């Protein structure tokens, strides 16, 4: 990666954490922002340039002159981030509802994993996820740094004069965000748009997390970031090694079986029939993974508590647990119904040539 990024930044931020993070961002404008604290939407600084883009997708490049007189919503995203995926139904709906009423939505794709630098992968994600608004590719973090941004996802709301007036870190607060859009449009003189709020029907990985039943947190499987890896021999860094399961797994512990190489950011399967087991407590279990060589595919089979998943299968798996890794992306493998309990997940790969990066839950 071109820049070291704190992977934990993608997690949803609570109210206190958002306040602390906002104070750390350069866009807050110091004394100027403080002098306008009584305003409903204070000035937080000027909208930074998007000139550091690697490429533009869904649009020709949009300079400041193109955005003058428009309300602009900037959304930092990376396509494997499940927290961002859960915000996407709202962003799509806002872009569609307000596009003819003065709003320009721009997605800034700043990659987390190495394969997310690949523009072909970003193009695939845009098409698969039905993103029709402009996307600026920020592969070298130039725009990320210009905004002093720290999180996926983040939303910045700019008025028609190019001033940032509001920001949202992480998921949630969708009604407030849409009211901000409406207020900025009204302030700019745009009329004739309904003040009703959008209604969305999220599917698959876009469904909001079940926070009441979430007892497992994101876990990267590369040695730099992973936690609770309990195969008996421990980690053999950057070496092909035969791993085995322990006698049992505790909650949020995971293990490997078969011949794997554990790298800094990912694990790679060297021989067919390799397995990963993970004991978890959540409605959803997702895994970011992909073939080691693009253009190939890897078959897999998922189980839960030693049985096919049946009705608990995720969007990318059938009831018998069968699926195929084709793209480098997030795969939703388990979606349970209530009651949620501690469960043991296992995935067996029937072919070699697989890389796995990150477990997420929801």
Model-identified regions with their sequence ranges:
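Structural microenvironment flanking redox-active thiols in thiol-disulfide oxidoreductases
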Residues: 85-128, 139-143, 298-300
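Short active-site neighborhood of thiol/selenol oxidoreductases, capturing the structured segment around
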Residues: 63-82, 105
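Short, internal strand/loop/helix patches
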Residues: 120-158, 287
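Non-globular targeting/processing and membrane-anchoring segments
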Residues: 14, 40, 45-51, 178-362
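Loop/turn elements at helix/coil->beta-strand transitions in domains of secreted/extracellular proteins
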Residues: 69-72, 101-104, 131-133, 160
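Non-catalytic, surface beta->alpha helical segment in thiol-disulfide oxidoreductase systems
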Residues: 164-185
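N-terminal secretory signal peptides
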Residues: 1-11, 18-21
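N-terminal "domain-start" segment that seeds a small globular fold
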Residues: 34-65
């Amino acid at each position: 990666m071109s820049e070291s990024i704190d992977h934990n930044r993608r997690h949803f931020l609570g109210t206190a954490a958002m306040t602390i993070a906002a104070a750390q961002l350069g866009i807050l404008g110091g004394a100027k922002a403080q002098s306008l604290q009584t305003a409903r939407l204070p000035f937080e600084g000027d909208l930074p340039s998007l000139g550091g883009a690697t490429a533009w997708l869904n649009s020709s490049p949009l300079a400041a002159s193109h955005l003058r007189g428009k309300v602009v919503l900037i959304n930092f995203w990376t396509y494997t981030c499940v927290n961002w995926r859960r915000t996407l139904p709202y962003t799509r709906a806002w872009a569609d509802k307000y596009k003819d009423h003065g709003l320009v939505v721009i997605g800034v794709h700043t990659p987390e994993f190495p394969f997310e630098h690949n523009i072909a992968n970003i193009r695939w994600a845009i098409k698969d996820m039905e993103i029709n608004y402009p996307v600026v590719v920020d592969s070298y973090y130039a725009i990320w740094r210009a905004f002093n941004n720290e999180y996926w996802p983040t939303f910045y709301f700019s008025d028609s004069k190019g001033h940032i007036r509001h920001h949202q870190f992480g998921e949630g607060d969708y009604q407030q965000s849409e009211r901000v859009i409406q207020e900025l449009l009204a302030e700019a003189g745009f009329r004739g748009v309904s003040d009703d709020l959008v209604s969305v029907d999220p599917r698959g990985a876009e469904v909001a997390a079940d926070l009441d039943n979430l007892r497992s947190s994101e876990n990267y499987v590369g040695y730099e970031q992973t936690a609770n890896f309990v195969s008996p021999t421990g980690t053999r860094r950057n070496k092909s090694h035969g791993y085995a399961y322990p006698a049992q797994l505790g909650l949020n512990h995971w293990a490997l079986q078969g011949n794997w190489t554990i790298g800094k950011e990912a694990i790679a399967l060297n021989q067919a029939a390799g397995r990963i087991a993970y004991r978890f407590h959540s409605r959803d279990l997702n895994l970011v993974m992909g073939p080691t060589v693009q253009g190939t595919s890897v078959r897999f089979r998922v189980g839960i508590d030693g049985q096919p998943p049946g009705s608990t299968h995720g969007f990318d798996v059938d009831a018998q647990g069968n699926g195929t890794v084709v793209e480098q992306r997030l795969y939703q493998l388990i979606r349970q119904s209530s009651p949620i309990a501690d469960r043991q997940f296992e995935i067996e790969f029937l072919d070699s040539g697989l890389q796995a990066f990150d477990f997420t839950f929801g």
